[in-house]
Design a protein with these regions (language model features):
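Absolute protein N-terminus
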Residues: 1-2, 93
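Short, well-ordered beta-strand segments in beta-rich or mixed alpha/beta enzyme
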Residues: 2-9, 39-67
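Short, surface-exposed ligand-recognition loops at beta-strand->loop->(often short) alpha-helix junctions
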Residues: 9-19
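Conserved GNAT-fold acetyl-CoA-binding loop/helix
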Residues: 19, 23, 69-70
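An amphipathic, aromatic/His-enriched active-site/gating alpha helix that lines ligand/cofactor pockets
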Residues: 27-37, 55-89
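A general secondary-structure junction signal
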Residues: 42, 91-93
Length: 93
């Protein structure tokens, strides 16, 4: 199992809209091959920052399967305009 860790810095004032968009986007990722689970947590000290933790069966399920899919294009359209700067994403085993 691989853990994807993404630090998401949302443009201040857009947090509620981001949470609403993420509630739609999470339905996309849940259907992807190799997906196990995910959590989105909001930072207590910096309420514009979130951490996204996604468990994948293997690294390529995320880096090739999800990111190479048409579903990822929908995910990007829902979420990427909220970020500044663009998220740091790393993987752990």
């Amino acid at each position: 199992m691989i853990l994807e860790v993404a630090i998401l810095n949302v443009i201040p004032g857009r947090e509620d809209a981001f949470i609403e968009a993420f509630s739609k986007a999470q339905d996309i990722i849940k259907k992807m091959a190799g997906y196990i689970s995910h959590q989105l947590k909001r930072c207590l000290e910096n309420t514009s920052q979130f951490i996204l933790l996604v468990e994948w069966e293997k690294l390529t399920d995320h880096t090739e399967g999800f990111r190479g899919s048409k579903e990822y294009q929908v995910w990007k359209g829902l979420l990427h305009h909220f970020y500044d700067p663009f998220p740091t994403v790393e993987h752990y085993e």
